[in-house]
């Protein structure tokens, strides 16, 4: 007979596998984009929609995931998330055109949006409060391994099999996870307040139309009139949500959040910063393969120092922020990240390839320092009654800004390369160099926002990872 302790342990393993699937997918696809483009007969500089469609879907669906779990139960929502993610992966592998792949990635994104937040909620419900931190450390460890192995695994599969296998690899894990969820996961429910369907639809339309407008010309080939229409639709939708949320206690996100100066600064700074940082995982593998002629596997291996730097930095972030304070850490880390990011193409084009892993290592360190510090700064002064709403809005904003970052990177590459590309040529080097220069400026700009953080804002609570 399975004891309660053993049952909980298996349930934690199920959540951990969900975290692994979701985080692996965020990095494994980037390395494969040039190969996918060649297979589908597309320009590799116009493949950002494959990433944007997934990340944007996650951003749109995040607000509904927690409510669905409370309403239907964590077991059935987590099971549905795994099934959707796995079926979406199968459809991605079967895609014969770019549009088919984008639609399949949307389906994947619906599952991915529910998997991680519902997994966190599951842990809260199945372990005692005093064991929550230890349980979360256990289930998030595979989530840290996913980004570490993703680029190299993606490059290996593309080079020695085909790009289809970066999606097919999810199938056995998904089937096992779905069966284990059915057999072992309890179906905890909670009483729920009324879901703000109107607000959800307004925000979804606003985010989707504005992101599509940004990606419309280079990624989707839309006319200027269509892009203007999307922008107008997005502005109207977001303005309508603001009006809808005024004095509405059932609003998806309370407008009282913006009365908190630190939260508002942190949210605006986080969104601005993640636009720049969101460009890096998309731009770097493409630069290595198209700009420098690296093989997919070699490009994937080159991404590992960035992940190692990120994981290593997380162990000392608390001490760094306690020593220097939020403002100094965020301003200096932001400016240093801009310099380090620009140095990558300079070092590579000058032939100093041995320094590239060092540059990527420091890039990962600075990114992790900014991310964790921004997350905690944003949430640290919120009262308990607004903490859940504030955290959900921050999570949604993070995903949205990363999709904007990928779209922006695609626009820059397409503009400077004039939508024509040849591997490892002076013209291609120039296109990437100008793109990285613009990206470095975008990365540096949030320092102006972070400089407005009060200097006495110190680290008096555990930093968000």
Swiss-Prot record:
PROSITE patterns (UniProt xref): MFS
Gene3D superfamilies reported for this sequence: MFS general substrate transporter like domains (1.20.1250.20), Multidrug resistance protein D (1.20.1720.10)
Membrane-related topology note: Multi-pass membrane protein
Domain of life: Bacteria
UniProt keywords, alphabetically: Cell inner membrane, Cell membrane, Membrane, Transmembrane, Transmembrane helix, Transport
Pfam families documented for this protein: MFS_1
GO terms for cellular component: plasma membrane
GO MF: transmembrane transporter activity
Family that this chain belongs to: Belongs to the major facilitator superfamily. TCR/Tet family.
Protein known as: Putative multidrug resistance protein MdtD
Species whose genome carries this gene: Yersinia pestis
Gene: mdtD
